[in-house]
């Protein structure tokens, strides 16, 4: 594959083939961005009819933590690029696939190994790169966990080393919270059951996601780091419920945020978009986490930027020029399923889209749960505050209902 020079025709011998591992709502938008550039896309997920399956050229259902199954699907499809969109993947198998020359892993196989769990990336950030982080400790038994809580102090945040969307995450405020927090973390981890990170609580003013792109500079043909405007967000129990762009912040804090994002993404290497999560208090900034892929809080860029985070990711991995410039203030607000049922319907769509500057993304997930993210409302505005009000109003207008 000639990076940045040539794209083929899908479903033909000249096709540029990309395989996504994980086909949720973020993967779906990446697939759409790739298909607009004439890329042949294969979507893989652990359950059928995932959002990305519905728009890909081909779809597969496998256990992506099974190295043999992962290797087999790669050998059958022969993609040029493999794009992980979730953490629960047999990353050692990806490293072997890349080493064998079967495909290029985005951003790199090493990056997927380091970021697949919170331990790898925290040790890289704090111990190798010397980035400011909250105090932390790891534990793989309840006894070690209790000792870690005592060492870090209360309040502290407890997370499985491997989970997503806030699953298994809680705050320990008193001794009575210790055992429930351990049990909740054990239930919420996707893989590597039994290991958690205990983090000291950072008294921050706000959280941001610094969307950071490593892409080819067309002028020099070297890899260059680009930054989107900071994305502010609100999380509840570790799960994003609202985001907006740009987040107002001091010039000093913005510079520190970008320095941290540059250091950690440069250490991970490769091409693509990274979501770097940071805590900010005044001019001080702490590193929290990084995902080597589009970030859920970055859904706002579908409305705020000329090239969304998904288009930036698609262009970057293909070696094409990127433009992360902000177009307008915008916001996003999550639409939850509200009920446990397959094949739900949504009412109030007309009212939601009647909100000035509003748009919707209904993800098409086949099964709803009360707190499952089933869609998102987007809105633009003259200011961030206006955009946030509009997005929340549009989201509130959408009513998930039983299709029975």
From Swiss-Prot:
Domain ATP-grasp: 123-318
Record GO biological process: 'de novo' IMP biosynthetic process
Protein name: Formate-dependent phosphoribosylglycinamide formyltransferase
PANTHER family, per the entry: FORMATE-DEPENDENT PHOSPHORIBOSYLGLYCINAMIDE FORMYLTRANSFERASE
Organism placement in taxonomy: Bacteria, Pseudomonadati, Pseudomonadota, Betaproteobacteria, Burkholderiales
InterPro entries registered for this protein in UniProt: ATP-grasp (IPR011761), ATP-grasp_carboxylate-amine (IPR003135), ATP_grasp_subdomain_1 (IPR013815), PreATP-grasp_dom_sf (IPR016185), PurT (IPR005862), PurT/PurK_preATP-grasp (IPR054350), PurT_C (IPR048740), Rudment_hybrid_motif (IPR011054)
Binding-site list for ATP: 118, 159, 164-169, 199-202, 207
Pathway named in the protein's UniProt entry: Purine metabolism; IMP biosynthesis via de novo pathway; N(2)-formyl-N(1)-(5-phospho-D-ribosyl)glycinamide from N(1)-(5-phospho-D-ribosyl)glycinamide (formate route): step 1/1
Protein function: Involved in the de novo purine biosynthesis. Catalyzes the transfer of formate to 5-phospho-ribosyl-glycinamide (GAR), producing 5-phospho-ribosyl-N-formylglycinamide (FGAR). Formate is provided by PurU via hydrolysis of 10-formyl-tetrahydrofolate.
Protein species of origin: Burkholderia cenocepacia (strain HI2424)
Keywords: ATP-binding, Ligase, Magnesium, Metal-binding, Nucleotide-binding, Purine biosynthesis
Catalytic activity reported: N(1)-(5-phospho-beta-D-ribosyl)glycinamide + formate + ATP = N(2)-formyl-N(1)-(5-phospho-beta-D-ribosyl)glycinamide + ADP + phosphate + H(+)
Self-association state and partner proteins as the record states: Homodimer.
TM ranges: none
Gene3D superfamilies recorded: 3.40.50.20, ATP-grasp fold, A domain, ATP-grasp fold, B domain
EC numbers, comma separated: 6.3.1.21
Residues annotated as binding N(1)-(5-phospho-beta-D-ribosyl)glycinamide: 25-26, 85, 296, 365, 372-373
EC class (word): ligase
